[in-house]
C-alpha cells in the first residue's frame, strides 16, 4: 500500500515538472493536447492532495481518539466496571451463583484432629509431670450446609440454620484408622470436677460419689479407649443409677450436657464431636446479604435470636463483629483486617495482614490471627474470668462460653507463656504447623488457603476431696487440637484467574491503545508537515564560470551567452532556411 502511494506521488510530481517546462517554453498550448494535459494534471493534483489530507486527518483523529480511549477505559472505565461487577456478584441474592456456593459449598473442608495420648498416667497420679504423645491427624471431610434460609428484603438479610457433617477419610489419615487404643483423660469426669471447683468447691465430695456410681468406681481419671470412641462413637454414661449423688448429677447432665447421645433407656454416649455430627444446630444465624452495600455482605446481625451475646461483662466483647466466617466483603487491601465472629468460641477474631503471597499462581495477601492477650490489652479484659484472673497471651478461658472449664490456646501452646509449655512434656510448637493463617485474593475476597487452628486444654490440680486427683500436679493439660482448613482446587482457582486474565488483556490493550494512538498522532503531524511542500519544485540557478587554462590546455565551456538555467531556443538548421 505504501509503495503504491509513493509511486502515485512521484508520477504526479513528474508530470508537474513536464507541464512547467512546456509552459515556460510556450510549447504547452502549441499542440492540441496541451490544454487537455493541463486539465488532467490539475485533476490528478487535486485528487492526490485531497486524498492525502483526508487520510492524514483520519490518521490524526483516529490516533487521538485511541489515545484518549486507552487512558479513560484502561485506567478508569474497566476498573470501575470490574469493581461494579464484583460488587454485584458477591451479593447473596436468591438464585445467584455465590448464594448457592455460600449456602451449600460443594467442597468439603479439611478437618484434622490431633489427640494427646498420655504415656505416664500412673506417674501423674503421684504428682509427676504429664508426658504426652501427639497422635494424628485423624482426617475428616467436613461438610457445612446452611438450611431453612429466610430472606428479609427490608433489612437486606438472610437467616439460616447450620448443619455440620464429618466423614472419616482414611486415605489422608496417614495410616490411622480410629481403632488406635489410647490412654486419655475422661473428659466428662474431668469437666465435672473442674466445673464444681469453680462454682461449688464444697460439693466436690458429692461429685466423687456420683463418679463412682455413674462410671462404676473407676480407679483412674485416665481411661483406655479407641480414638474413634473418644472423637465420635462415644464412651458410656450410665444414668440408670438410683443413689442420690448419681441421680442428681445425671439429672444435671441431661439438661446441661449438649453432647450426650442416647444409647438406650437412661444410658448415653459421650464424645467430643458425636453429638454435633449430622445434626442441625439449634441456634440460627442472621447475616446481611450485601445487596444494598457490598461491604456488609456476611456481617452478623443476630445469633440465636439476639443482636449480641450476653455472657461477657462489656458490650464490645458481646458485639457481633465481622462476618460469619464463610464469606467476606471484596475489594480490600493490606490496611484492612479480616474480622469474623466464631460462634463456637463466643467471640470475634481479627486477622492482620503480614505479607504478600502467591497460591497456585494467584497473587494473595497472607493474614494471621491469634487469641489476643487479655492480660495486657484493655479491650480484651472483658474475656477474663475475673478482672484479676486474666490468662497470658493466646490463652482464652472458654468456661462461660461452653459451660465446662475449657482453656483455648494455639496448638502446642504456640506463641504463649513458656511456663505452660514447661508443665508437660511432648509439645513442640512451631509457626508453620500451629499458627492461624489464611491467604486471600483481595479483589474477590476468596480464601485460596486457610488454616483455623485451636487447642483445647483443662487445668489439673491436686483435689484432696476427690481421690482420683488427690495428688495430681498443677498443669494446663492439652487434650486435643483441631485444624479446619481449605485449599481451593484448580476448578475454583481457575474461576478466580478469569478475573485476572481479563485484567491482563485490558492491561495490554490499554498500553497498546495509548502508545499506538500517540504514535498515530505523531505520524499524522509529520505527514501533514511534509505534505505542505509536496507539490513544490525547487530549481537552482547555475551560472557558468569563465574559461580557464590548465597544463596549457583550454577548458571546454558553454558559450557565455548560454544560461543553462533556462531552455534556449534552438538554432534553425540552414537546410530549413533554404526552403
Which residue ranges define each predicted feature?
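Extracellular or lumenal secretory-pathway regions
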Residues: 47-363, 370-568
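Alpha-helical and His/Cys-centered functional microenvironments
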Residues: 572
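Non-catalytic, peripheral interaction segments enriched in hydrophobic/basic residues
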Residues: 1-44
